[in-house]
Amino acid sequence: MNPENWLLLRRVVRFGDTDAAGVMHFHQLFRWCHESWEESLESYGLNPADIFPGSRKSEVTPEVALPIIHCQADFRRPIHTGDALAMELRPERLNPNSFQVHFEFRCEEQIAAHALIRHLAINAQTRHRCALPEGIDRWLEASGVGKIGSI
């Protein structure tokens, strides 16, 4: 399986994604990051019900939660309604219980924005750190960046 199938996604900016000035509002970029991460996991073959609580198809609540502990974004140029964006995800394992995903948004071959979202694995009951879920581990390894680094 080719990582490009789940790490390079495309999307068109809709009117509802923009503000009164006609450009993407900053919070929409973070929503797109999270949605593209979810889409990436699904394209890789993971069932969202196994990762995210509250899914209709979930028979049990996942034992591990993955809260966002850090996020940042930089806009390099305005993103307008109708812009076709290519979104590249670059996941990076930080240690056995955390990872981050770098996002690059391109419009007409120019970088329009960068973002980063960092997740920490915690036991959903105790709220203490724990190992990443097996599916996330597999996704990180298959994405070709599964080496443990420093935070």
Curated annotation (Swiss-Prot):
GO biological process, one term: phylloquinone biosynthetic process
Pathway: Cofactor biosynthesis; phylloquinone biosynthesis; Quinol/quinone metabolism; 1,4-dihydroxy-2-naphthoate biosynthesis; 1,4-dihydroxy-2-naphthoate from chorismate: step 7/7
Function: Catalyzes the hydrolysis of 1,4-dihydroxy-2-naphthoyl-CoA (DHNA-CoA) to 1,4-dihydroxy-2-naphthoate (DHNA), a reaction involved in phylloquinone (vitamin K1) biosynthesis.
Name of this protein: 1,4-dihydroxy-2-naphthoyl-CoA hydrolase
Entry keywords, A to Z: Hydrolase
UniProt EC number: 3.1.2.28
Catalysed reactions, as listed in the record: 1,4-dihydroxy-2-naphthoyl-CoA + H2O = 1,4-dihydroxy-2-naphthoate + CoA + H(+)
Broad EC category: hydrolase
Family: Belongs to the 4-hydroxybenzoyl-CoA thioesterase family. DHNA-CoA hydrolase subfamily.
InterPro entries listed in its UniProt record: DHNA_CoA_hydrolase (IPR022829), HotDog_dom_sf (IPR029069)
HAMAP family reported in the protein's UniProt record: DHNA_CoA_hydrolase
Species: Prochlorococcus marinus (strain MIT 9313)
